[in-house]
Amino acid sequence: IVKGCFADDPFLFERQAAGVPAYSDTYWNNKPQNMEANRQRIFEHTRPQFIRCWHDVAYNSDALVACLYEYWLCYKTPRFAKRLHYIPLPMEIPHESSARIKGMGRTIKVLVGIQPKRDYLKGAKRIASFVESVARRHPDKIEIKYIEGVPYDEYMHMLDEADVLVDQLYSYTPSMNSLAAMARGTVVI
């Protein structure tokens, strides 16, 4: 049995409350954040029947596999360390010449992908507010484009054109968005 350590589970919430990792979508500087937005999510994953199911799988698995560093960090405890493995998310380079130097001698194109119902989990708007302040000081040098709800192929084309992608604040590890951007030579913040 292999247990995937991916995002929401009662152990991750427990570890986040204990300050591991140092910041997350539920805790920042050892203080709860976004708790109202996270209330239903945390409730669902900390119900007794969910905890029993998680416990049965976690304690009876042959291996635990984390795909993000922060999940690996949460599970790196004496009770799980010997069975814990880290397998990062894959990065696919779309075509050989896709990674290139961008933004040379022209306006820097910044792409901000927003999932309105999930931004409290990601924190992209927090980063974007800093980019906006830089753009206000240098309006002729930075162009910010906010997008949401576009088809995947269109989004990949936008990544090809972007110089910078604003991605997740609360993740220690590059997400699939970040990896797709970096494969195209796009800087990720």
Where do the language-model regions lie?
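Helix-loop-beta element that forms the nucleotide-linked donor phosphate-binding surface
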Residues: 55-60, 64-66, 71-91
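Conserved catalytic-core segment of nucleotide-activated headgroup transferases in glycan assembly
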Residues: 73-74, 83-152
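A short, aliphatic-rich alpha-helical micro-motif
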Residues: 58, 159-160, 182
